[in-house]
A protein has these predicted regions:
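Conserved GNAT acetyl-CoA-binding A-motif
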Residues: 119-131
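Helix-turn-helix
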Residues: 137
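Structural motif
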Residues: 122, 143-144
Length: 172
């Protein structure tokens, strides 16, 4: 049974992501052409080496974040990391991942719901997502109620020019 817990010193340490499987085989991505996003062929593999996993572990356990873990026993199989500091009306999802072997099990939906709960508690109007442009990633965020924003946060959009800038407004 996968459980969702707030990251703490009791359930997370620097090597907690050592066996995490970021791997994603991407076939199609969204690209802006003529003012519209269209799907184009662009095959590549997204993955993390040991150094990247350690860097991510350090980042998501920072004091400036609220991070929830999806745990299978004591093994991290997913996480959502939100920036505590609101940016205007938005709480920013800095990272959200589900390990390759656990995708399609509803873990991402559960993590995203926790993100919405935290945003609501913080007084945000919406979650802000700089989404990887892969077909599957964008489909997930759309299924969760997110849409492209007309008002991207410039520094985030500039930092990730191929990402789609999305928001998910919180229901009353």
């Amino acid at each position: 049974m996968i459980r969702i817990e707030l990251l703490s010193k009791d359930n997370f340490h620097p090597d907690s992501l050592d066996h995490y499987q970021r791997k994603q085989e991407v076939k199609k991505v969204y690209r802006k052409q003529g003012g519209e996003y269209i799907l184009v062929d662009c095959a590549y593999t997204e993955d993390w080496d040991a150094g990247k996993r350690h860097s991510v572990a350090q980042t998501i356990s920072g004091d400036d974040r609220i991070t929830y873990l999806a745990l299978d026993e004591d093994r991290v199989v997913g996480f959502i990391s939100l920036l505590k500091q609101l940016e205007g009306p938005y709480m920013i999802i800095d990272m959200m991942q589900v390990s390759a072997e656990c995708r399609g099990l509803g873990i991402g939906r559960r993590l995203f719901r926790r993100g919405k709960e935290e945003a609501r508690k913080a007084g945000a109007e919406a979650l802000y997502i700089s989404a990887c442009s892969s077909e599957e990633t964008v489909a997930f965020y759309k299924a969760m109620g997110s849409k492209l924003t007309d008002f991207p946060i410039k520094r985030i959009a500039d930092d990730e020019p191929y990402d789609l800038q999305m928001v998910c407004y919180l229901e009353g």
